[in-house]
UniProtKB/Swiss-Prot annotation:
This is Probable potassium transport system protein Kup. Its main location: membrane. Transport of potassium into the cell. Likely operates as a K(+):H(+) symporter. InterPro entries: K+_transporter, K_trans_C, K_trans_N, Kup. One of its GO terms (cellular component) is plasma membrane. It comes from Leuconostoc mesenteroides subsp. mesenteroides (strain ATCC 8293 / DSM 20343 / BCRC 11652 / CCM 1803 / JCM 6124 / NCDO 523 / NBRC 100496 / NCIMB 8023 / NCTC 12954 / NRRL B-1118 / 37Y). HAMAP family: Kup.
Amino acid sequence: MLKENQSKWSSAGALIAIGIVFGDIGTSPLYTMNSILNSAKSAHNLDTFVIGSVSLVFWTLMLITTIKYVIIALQADNHGEGGIFALYSRVKKPNKKWLLLPALIGGAALLADGTLTPAVTVTTAIEGLKGQGIGEFIFPNNQTIVLFVVTVILLIVFTFQKAGTKKIGKIFGPVMLTWFLFIGFFGLVNIFSDLSILKALSPTYAIAVLFSPENKTGIFILGSVFLATTGAEALYSDMGHVGKHNIYVSWIFVYTMLILNYMGQGAWIMSHANQENLLMQSSNPFFEILPSGWRIFGVVMAALAAIIASQALISGAYTLVSEAINLKVIPRLRTFYPSEARGQMYIGTVNWLLCIIGLIIVWAFQTSHNMEAAYGLSITITMLMTTLLLYQFIKQEMKNKILAFFFVVIFGMIETVFLIASLGKFLHGGYATLIIMVAILSVMMIWFYGNKRREAISQQNDYLSLKDYRKQLINLSKDNEEPIFASNLVYIVNIHQNYMLKRNIIYSILGSKPKRAETYWFVTIRSSNDPYEKSYSVDMLGTNNIVHVTLNIGFKVEPQVNMYMKQIANNLVKQNIIKPQFPKYTLNKRGTVGEFKYIMANQNYEDLLNLPDIHTWDRFIISGRLWLQSHTVKPSSFYGLEVSDVLEETVPLFIKDSNKSKIKLIQNEVKNVIKPE
């Protein structure tokens, strides 16, 4: 949905929100109650336990999802975008450098937990097929076959990502609407089997079950309850797709359907409390509440909902990584834009890492029961980090220190309790997502602080003023004794105040082989907080052939630098700001702009590692940063210059002073000299 239409809700927008935003939280009923049942001491006298457990789910969704995320967090958007990195971009200040740490930890944890979501949702859905018949065919009660089916589904989902979801995405809303109506209806039907489940609306039962003798895990039951709200962070992250007003309206419907289903599952469990196989892993209350004639339809709908939830998570991962690249905390990654649909992107590295890790998890954990035991630990960390950033938002943007204090205390305590409860998952597989989180966080820290240390060490003699070299560039441009290197010579640079730019750029132009051009272009690309911004400004530096262009590009916009430069050059020619160029050989006989040649002048930062006084920590982090750079996309590819005329250069980081090291002439004479006439 277009950003300009997000200021108000519409029925179409609400339908899109149901299809995109609520996939993760909407598939939680597949496994939440099943996981909670593992905390039951026995299959007898379950009423108090079940009512208390459903009450915990109800109030968890009310407090964390509804109040924290839907009511409060959705106010903290950054140009309409949500999520932990968008929130950080909104609140970051030069004097609040500590805010970066919770943003990095939260972002890494969110990406790590996302590796488990497709695996657990799709596996749970397909497990519902066990023993079910379609005509004369009976699906085998064989977990290995389930794993193969899950593998095929996940491979198909990840393989088709590069094609985009413009066409198929139109059915997400209707499918998820059908899903929520389906689970809500059968939940309501089962509530009538034991109306005492309605007691779950009282918070007293939620508190009581934590200390109930029927609860064999005590407070650690919250680790399973938390599964009901793991999609809340994804809900916030997907705000930019549909707008907060559509989320407000659609959440009322979604929340109602979810609670009806959880209560229906609870009522079914209580009405079957004396069945000895009730606590068996093969007995999932989500599927058990369905009449036998509806089971196959339920499995198909669950599989579709799981696929859509996975799709939403994958798209959210692309957005999250793009925001991280925009903040310069992750190396540049090759990004494709499968269609002209706004916000559609594809990052192959992210896609296949999610796929590979997800498949490893499927085959390592084998069953949805084992995956549930590991799921949710990392997301509690993300939620705690979001709470810290929201505290800063309320205090800084809403100017309400009292509300900020109560917010961070209340939700900090609630989420800390959930984190402690989820720590019980560590030995049951939670370590897997924590390892992934630490790996992602390490990449972020090395890249960000590697850049900081690299710049701090090298900047002492690393910058020159472009203004000081205007005359030389103008003279070089007019020097007919030098061959024309290019009509338009373009450098991607970062120009600071007073026209300061890196010395390697001037070295590249005026070095041993001067590069003569009709027009010199120095292009600074700014990453805009507005995800869809495409704008530019021009500074001619008092000349007609030295141009500083600043491109402001949002992180959801394809950086087609060559196309933008041709448009800008033609505009400047039309305005008579730069002289027209008439190429001798060209397809466009009316063209007034010649060819563009791009120079990527890369400094050899490995020179830093050879400095005798460099600190061991600096050496380590800069080495790590250089290693990451060597394994990621080149700037020319990132800026869409693959089919352009690009020259990659490497220039020395330090130019040695010839006066510091002198060589001595033997015998103080030169032999056999012929003096010039």
